[in-house]
Amino acid sequence: MKEKRYFNVRLEFDKRKLEQTIENAIKEGTVGYVCSVESNNLTVANNNSEFLNVLNGALVNNCDGSVLAKILGYIHHEPLESHIGADIFIKYVRMCQYRQFFLGNTQEVLSGLKDNLSKIDPEIKNMRFETLPFRKVDEFDYQGIAQMINEDGPDIIWVSLGAPKQEMFMNRLQPYLHRGVMFGFGAIFNFNAGVGNVRRAPNWMLKLKLEWLHRAFEDPKKNVPRYWNFIKTLPRLIKEEMKRDDG
């Protein structure tokens, strides 16, 4: 399935098609990865051709930013809605039908995550939660990591290394896997672990599509520069997108 490109990145805004693509891949034993595209990795992709190719090499990509969806909807004169990675994550956990593998982040977060998710699906107690050594993306032992995953045989592999590292990691790991769909969903492990300082926005902010603002205040040192880089890149992207839409 080839999605239309928005701001040069393949995105699937149709929730039914997004889920169908993922579930068909799991059913057929296809190896692939899913990227949750928001302002940060979109900005990186439009300033780094290698990373752009990584995003566009995904099985399918969801739009993780409500502001991003609104901007694109305005340009293309159609209602486009974001599909937030945190919601996709909890949906597949609650389905209680897939074997999953949780990879990355810290041992503290993984322990909290396992405890909390096991309350939703008791089978998760028997699933693998593995940290990774801190190193550059090109320095991982991909064959060794893949062997560990292949021996477990999961349907879904959740990867939490932060963007853009996790997307590049999945792209490099893919050739060594026998089956399984990888999801690079960053801080979602933290959201659901109940430990540390990283929390998802409260419900009232989610309803008002203000999760981006919550993240800015929660970790300004990291997120404010990311938003600023997006704002600087946005005029060029809008101009190019409007030209393509008119053409």
Protein language model features and the residues they cover:
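A short helix->loop->beta-strand "cap" motif at the edges of active sites that frequently abuts
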Residues: 31, 98, 177-181
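Proline-aspartate-enriched helix->loop->beta-strand connector
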Residues: 149, 153-158, 162-163, 179
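A transmembrane-helix-recognition feature enriched in membrane-embedded lipid enzymes
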Residues: 69-70, 200-247
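Short, flexible loop segments at boundaries between secondary-structure elements
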Residues: 132-137, 178-216
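Short Gly/Thr/Asp-enriched flexible loops that form oxyanion-binding sites at enzyme active sites
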Residues: 114, 167-176
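N-terminal nucleotide/polyanion-binding subdomain common to many enzyme families
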Residues: 1-81, 86-87
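Short glycine-rich anion-binding loops that position phosphate/pyrophosphate groups of nucleotides
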Residues: 39-42, 161-166, 188
